[in-house]
C-alpha cells in the first residue's frame, strides 16, 4: 500500500510539474467532457463566471485567521492550482471510487498539503466567510468538509459539470467574484464563502490527472 501511494506521488509530480517535461495521458485527455472524477484525482477547479482557477500558495492572510490564503488565479498553467479529491475520515470511499452528488469531500492542496478550509472569520475584501488552507496530511477537522452539489440530474461528478461546494460547518458556498487583490496576490481575485446560492458559486472540474474509475464504481 505504501509503495502504491509513493508511485502515485511520483506519477503526479512528473505529470503536473511544468518543468518536468512529462505530460500524462490523463491530463492530455482531460479536455473531453464526461470524464469521471474519482477520489485521489488531482484537479483544477475553474470558476464558471470568471474562468479563474481555485488557487493557493504559501502566503498567509494579513487579516482574519492568518492562515494560508486561497485565491482565484487567472492563468491555466500553475501547479499551485491543483487539488487532490479526498473522502472524509470514517467513510468507506477509497481511491478510484466515483464521487457522488451529495457526498462530503475534502480538497487537499497538492503543493502545500493543506486542506481547503472555511470558518467564521471575515474574508479580506468583501467581509464574507473566509476560505483558507489549513492542516496537513495528518491534521484535518470538519472545517475541511465540503458537500458536493451537482447542478442538474447528474449522480456522479464529471469533468465540465456545473457544481457547488457547500461548507459543512458554516453552510457557505465556495464563491468567487471579480474583486481583486492589489498587493500580495495582485491580479488574483477573492475566494470566500457565502450562504446564498448565486451564479458566482458555480465551479467546474477542468485540467488534471483523473485516476481510473474502480470497476466496483461502474
From Swiss-Prot:
SMART domains: MIR
GO CC annotation: endoplasmic reticulum; vacuole
PROSITE patterns xrefs: MIR
Induction: By tunicamycin.
Record note on disruption phenotype: No visible phenotype under normal growth conditions, but mutant plants are insensitive to seedling growth inhibition in response to the pathogen-associated molecular pattern (PAMP) elf18 and show increased susceptibility to phytopathogenic bacteria.
Domain MIR intervals: 34-88, 96-151, 154-208
Span of the signal peptide: 1-21
InterPro entries, per the entry: MIR_dom_sf, MIR_motif
Alphabetical keyword list: Endoplasmic reticulum, Glycoprotein, Plant defense, Repeat, Signal
Glycosylation sites: 214
Pfam families: MIR
Subcellular location as annotated: Endoplasmic reticulum
GO BP annotations listed: defense response to bacterium; defense response to fungus; pattern recognition receptor signaling pathway
Complex formation: Interacts with ERDJ3B.
Xref: PANTHER family: GH21273P, STROMAL CELL-DERIVED FACTOR 2-LIKE PROTEIN
Protein name (record): Stromal cell-derived factor 2-like protein
UniProt source species: Arabidopsis thaliana
Gene name of the encoded protein: SDF2
